[in-house]
Amino acid sequence: MYFKDGFRDEVAIIGMGCSKFGERWDTGLEDLIIEAAFEAFADAGIGPKDVQVAYFANTAAPNNCSGTPVADALKMHGIPITRNENWCTAGHIALINAVLAVKSGMCIPAMAI
């Protein structure tokens, strides 16, 4: 999904986080999400309670993780968390949905996980 004029002057990425790379077979999916999310919160200077909507990218996780366990782990209750599953492009789809949510005026900020 591409837009002719883009959103350069209207939407910004204010924070970014990433879980540590490596063979971490003993680390669960939710722990990896928490690690990346709290790094992004610190980078943006916001907390979980500031997020108004979130889009969770899932790539065929064996436990079929929905947005609800993520909401519980991040203490992000009372907001919509939409799960996107689209194999290798799941993260891209989550980011596009977060951009569209902000662009539409639905919320500020949105989060792509």
What is each residue range found by the language model?
Residues 92-100:
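Conserved phosphate-binding catalytic cores of ATP/NTP-utilizing and phosphoryl-transfer enzymes
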Residues 80-93:
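Cysteine-centered functional microenvironments
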Residues 1-83, 100-104, 111:
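Conserved "HGTGT" condensation-loop signature of ketosynthase/thiolase-family condensing enzymes
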